[in-house]
Amino acid sequence: GTGKTPMTEYLVETLRKEYKTATLSRGYKRKTKGFAIADQNTTAIDIGDEPMQFHQKFPDITVAVGEERLVAIPQLLHQQPETQVIILDDAFQHRSVKAGLNLLLTEYKNLYTRDLMLPAGDLRDVKTSRKRADMIIVTKCKSDLTEFEKNELIKEISPLPRQQVYFTEIVYAPPYHLFNAAKKADIGIGSDILLLCGIANPKPLMEFLTKHVHSYDMIRYADHHIFTIDDLKEIKKHFEKMQSTNKIILTTEKDAVRLEKFKT
């Protein structure tokens, strides 16, 4: 929930302009095993929702999955030898991989300095590992973060002299139709939203909707939830009960790739 996916997309968008770029992910909750590269027939079931999202948004790059990164990297380079940059979206804890640049993401409202290791907290590595980072990026910051607040956060993070600290925020683009990306949805202060959400940390989206729409109800699912026909029936029933003439079903990009299988 630190914002790895939007950061990966930002890096892809930036790097693919000059370098042959690839992403390599574990492919969490996919139904396949081993190494695979996405093609025109690939679905979220094959590679996982986040890699599928990358594949849909950036069809010109290589999107690969593999549980063992150390094994998958040479396989990727063998099949795509022109690759110049590989972005691993969740590999900081994989010490066997010697990355050219290590980025450590930590959420503004839940800095790693205040967190604990799994299962007591959300950390996947010991706090001392932050020394391996080249850059520390504080994600999901509020838009009006002051210089004083930034300096206080930097003091808490206590970076090494060689480490740079950056601050980012989430800016939501206009929503679009699930099966027609060119068709934009018009939501605003008069809209009543049914939010379908199966991501690790929906709080930033909930805070955004609280400020920008009339009201919202949320059906919450587990992260990487695989939608079923019964889920669709529940969604339809909930939506029909909403007493509004300006209602809309809204979901995240990551959830959307898992809903596309229902396209008719």
List the predicted regions and their residue ranges.
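Phosphate/Mg2+-binding loops and adjacent switch elements
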Residues: 27-161
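Generic C-terminus detector
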Residues: 242, 247-248, 256-264
